[in-house]
Amino acid sequence: MERGPVVGAGLGARARIRTLLGCLVKVLLWVASALLYFGSEQAARLLGSPCLRRLYHAWLAAVVIFGPLLQFHVNPRTIFASHGNFFNIKFVNSAWGWTCTFLGGFVLLVVFLATRRVAVTARHLSRLVVGAAVWRGAGRAFLLIEDLTGSCFEPLPQGLLLHELPDRRSRLAAGHQWRGYTVSSHTFLLTFCCLLMAEEAAVFAKYLAHGLPAGAPLRLVFLLNVLLLGLWNFLLLCTVIYFHQYTHKVVGAAVGTFAWYLTYGSWYHQPWSPGSPGHGLFTHPSRKHN
């Protein structure tokens, strides 16, 4: 006979719990939205500063030139000292794939939302095609340098026996070793990706200043690119500390910087190029973004 009031009380309690959970979810979503808005605004302002962008080049140079000195002050047994560590396998070895995926999504959204023109969007995305060509071309050039400067060695109990055999592929298949000048492809790629991402992401500050659509998806994609840029900086530091010879790292970073200069610093400012980041997107005077 008393089940009616008990059941009613139970239903009322569950309803209150659902209401509280609904309110909690709304609060969490509001906090997440506020953090997303604030974080994207601050990151855009930071990356869009011309002064800080110039300092960023100096930062990368300092990392490559002076970073190897830290090898005397760090634990040589840390996980980052192993070639087989998770970050080296999953991120560094596929750095261009990660960069192209994240940055491609960002460029696609920014350009299309700003212009609503497929042709302009495709033109800006072609910078990533050029970047892929630079990456592939540099990799082949590094292998050619190693072939031209190398010699074949056969491991023996007493040491190494030098062979006057120029065919590197057949010598490696026979179990011999090929030693030549090896430009650090990881240092090259991470340096190039850092400079490229910093250049592309800097456009977001001007995008916001012009009051263009900047919803949560775009802001999230932008912040993911910022996080990836931070990861590349960290992994570049790990690379110069733990791996490769000093000159190999410096040359790799120098080639990456030179590749950035030839493209973003020179060619992309010409009319017969893919265009520099932000070119042709902002045709109206900027206004404060609310």
Swiss-Prot record:
Plays an important role in the formation of lipid droplets (LDs) which are storage organelles at the center of lipid and energy homeostasis. Directly binds to diacylglycerol (DAGs) and triacylglycerol. This is Fat storage-inducing transmembrane protein 1. The record marks H248 as: Important for catalytic activity. Belongs to the FIT family. FIT1 subfamily. The active site is at H186, H244. The lineage of its organism: Eukaryota, Metazoa, Chordata, Craniata, Vertebrata. Keywords: Endoplasmic reticulum, Lipid metabolism, Membrane, Transmembrane, Transmembrane helix. GO terms for cellular component: endoplasmic reticulum membrane. The chain crosses the membrane at residues 19-39, 55-75, 95-115, 142-162, 188-208, 221-241, 250-270. HAMAP family: FITM1, FITM2. It comes from the Eukaryota. It is a multi-pass membrane protein. One of its GO terms (biological process) is lipid droplet formation.
